[in-house]
Structures are given as C-alpha cells and as structure tokens.
C-alpha cells in the first residue's frame, strides 16, 4: 500500500474514532472497509503500532490503535471454533488461524504448537515459535522469537527479533489510555520465567531479565554500580534481577522501620560481543 493510500486510511479512521459513538455493528461502507484494511495490514506485518527510528526512539502510530478499538464496536459477538474436543468460544475477535491450512502455515514460516492462541491482527514473523501461549490483537512478534509456554503478549505489544519470552512471562498490553505507548521488548532480549513487563515500559536491545522481575512505570530500576534510579526503560545490554530498596527514614505506625520496597536491579552491563557468547545462567550469576 502506498504512502498516499495509508494517509487516506489514517484520515478515515481518525474521523471515525472522533465520531465513535455513532459506530456500531450496523456501520457499513468506508469506515468498516478502512478498519478491516488496517487490521489486515497489522495481521500481515505491513504496518506496526509502533516503529523504531534510527535514533532508537519509538514512534506510536495511534491511528492503528484506534482501528483496533473501532473493531470492537463494528464486530458483533460470534462463535469462534477451534477448541479442544470441537469446543467453541464466544468473542468479537476471530483467531488469526481461522481458515488456515498447510499452505498458509508454510507461507507464514512460524511454528504454532497446539493450544497457542493468536488473535486476528497480531503478526508473527518467520521462524518464531509459539508454545501454548497467548498473543493478543495488534501485537508484533519478531523473527526467530520464542514465546514459551503460558507466556502472554498483550495487545499491541512489540516483541523484537530473537527474543526469548520464558514460561509464564507477561508482556502487558496497552490500548487505552490512547496516548500511552505499547510495551516493547527490543531485539535479542531474554525475559526470565514468570517476569512481567507492563504499562508501556521498554526493555532495550540485548538485555536479560532474571526470573520473577516485575517492571511497570512506577518500578524503580536501580543501577547497582552507580546508584542511579530510573523508571520505565531498561538500558541496552543490562542484566536485571529482582531486588529491594530501604525505605530511608520512614517508619511504621508502631515506630519500627518501614519495610524495604521492591525494585529491579541492574547488576551488570555487558557489550554485544559478551552477550552473544555468554550463557544466560552465567550472566545472572553474581
């Protein structure tokens, strides 16, 4: 699709979103066609909810988030087939794999293990592997990435190339508030089992999160080497584990010192060469 066509599509969706109270399941014509076209482009990976510039800054294409939100108004509830034992679900969003056969899967080039769930408008790149997991609408999963068992990729989340999302990992989805950016895991990251990255936080390229690390917008990210505290973004090639920080001079009602509070701790930083040659377990040893 040309830049002119994309601009026209964006204009139609922006206008429809501004008038969304009048968009419903009976809406036909230009608005429905535009939303369907946007979802198809997302599904095929031809557009993304967020794109990374040469300077490392991420730009959010809000109109694509608006297209996803409008689809909930346009689509009625319907039976979704494909459950075990010929069971069904009841939802507004069909499976990405609806109507797929061998040719579709071979052309797509990724592995989809039984019981993985991918909703329409999510993109899965070639050589990705989906264990029994959940990938929500509008998400992007990059080439060669492993989404391990019971991991969740939230709505519009952006997962880079050659990422490993370990068992039970949660990558948060962000559709609303509209101005919020999606949660982003850049290329070559490892996210340890049962960790959570949410609320539009960014894990930069080559970083390693140990098991059970939780990062939201209000989570303190502490660099152990410098004492620097930051929020919302893990720097490139950081090795991060769960930790805690003293509450300073704060006390409880009984006069005793207040408990320590959770934080994420950057225990070391490695260069690209070291990261590529060193095993994950070795990196996480203190």
Swiss-Prot record:
Keywords: Acyltransferase, Amino-acid biosynthesis, Cytoplasm, Diaminopimelate biosynthesis, Lysine biosynthesis, Repeat, Transferase. The keyword DNA repair does not apply. Pathway: Amino-acid biosynthesis; L-lysine biosynthesis via DAP pathway; LL-2,6-diaminopimelate from (S)-tetrahydrodipicolinate (succinylase route): step 1/3. Its EC number is 2.3.1.117. Transmembrane segments: none annotated. SUPFAM superfamilies: Trimeric LpxA-like enzymes (SSF51161). It comes from Rhizobium leguminosarum bv. trifolii (strain WSM2304). It catalyses: (S)-2,3,4,5-tetrahydrodipicolinate + succinyl-CoA + H2O = (S)-2-succinylamino-6-oxoheptanedioate + CoA. One of its GO terms (biological process) is lysine biosynthetic process via diaminopimelate. GO terms for molecular function: 2,3,4,5-tetrahydropyridine-2,6-dicarboxylate N-succinyltransferase activity; nucleotidyltransferase activity. PROSITE patterns: HEXAPEP_TRANSFERASES (PS00101). PANTHER family: 2,3,4,5-TETRAHYDROPYRIDINE-2,6-DICARBOXYLATE N-SUCCINYLTRANSFERASE (PTHR19136:SF52), MOLYBDENUM COFACTOR GUANYLYLTRANSFERASE (PTHR19136). This is 2,3,4,5-tetrahydropyridine-2,6-dicarboxylate N-succinyltransferase. NCBIfam families: dapD, PRK11830.1. The gene is dapD. GO terms for cellular component: cytoplasm. It is found in: Cytoplasm.
